[in-house]
């Protein structure tokens, strides 16, 4: 990721599973593992031919899109459909929050600044998800 060129066009996407702690606490880590694998599979099948998918934490992922940038919105819709249509062995559904930044949005000082902006957008998306769903995020 640190080798990305700030003068080229690419997209940085921060993604995070919603409700993983609740799933782990309520049903055990087998269920959490199923959700993490499913989210990764949805990301890979939606984005891999256009860039790379990285797992950067327990339920946190970064996607870097370097090809077909004009098709990015379509890639996101495909990803959202895959997540919405997924049904697991242990859990009925999953939800993933994301935020993204185009490298061309403005003059960035560093990739860290881009990742920070993307994370902030993802956390806003996550906050809205928990407000809409009525779930307590801390549980």
Residues covered by each model-derived region:
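Short beta-strand-to-loop capping motifs
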Residues: 63-68, 102-104
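Active-site core of bacterial EAL-family cyclic-dinucleotide phosphodiesterase domains
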Residues: 13, 128, 139
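Conserved long alpha-helical elements within nucleotide-processing catalytic cores of c-di-GMP signaling
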Residues: 1-11, 18-48, 54-58, 62-63, ...
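A structural signal for short, well-ordered beta-strand segments
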Residues: 12, 61, 96-100
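Catalytic-core segments of nucleotide cyclases and related cyclic-nucleotide turnover enzymes
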Residues: 29, 73-80, 84, 102-131
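Catalytic core regions of nucleotide second-messenger enzymes
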Residues: 55-56, 83-99, 132-137
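Residue-level signal for beta-strand positions within conserved beta-sheet cores that form or flank
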Residues: 8, 49, 92-96
């Amino acid at each position: 990721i640190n080798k990305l060129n700030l003068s080229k066009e690419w997209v940085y996407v921060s993604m995070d599973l919603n409700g993983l702690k609740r799933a782990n606490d309520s049903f055990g880590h087998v269920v959490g593992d199923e959700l993490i694998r499913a989210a990764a599979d949805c990301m890979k099948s939606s984005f891999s031919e256009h860039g790379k998918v990285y797992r950067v934490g327990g339920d946190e992922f970064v996607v870097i899109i370097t090809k077909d940038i004009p098709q990015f919105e379509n890639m996101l819709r495909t990803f959202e459909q895959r997540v919405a249509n997924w049904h697991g062995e242990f859990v009925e559904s999953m939800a993933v929050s994301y935020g993204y930044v185009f490298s061309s949005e403005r003059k960035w000082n560093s990739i860290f600044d881009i990742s920070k902006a993307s994370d902030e957008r993802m956390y806003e998306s996550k906050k809205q998800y928990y407000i809409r769903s009525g779930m307590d995020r801390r549980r």
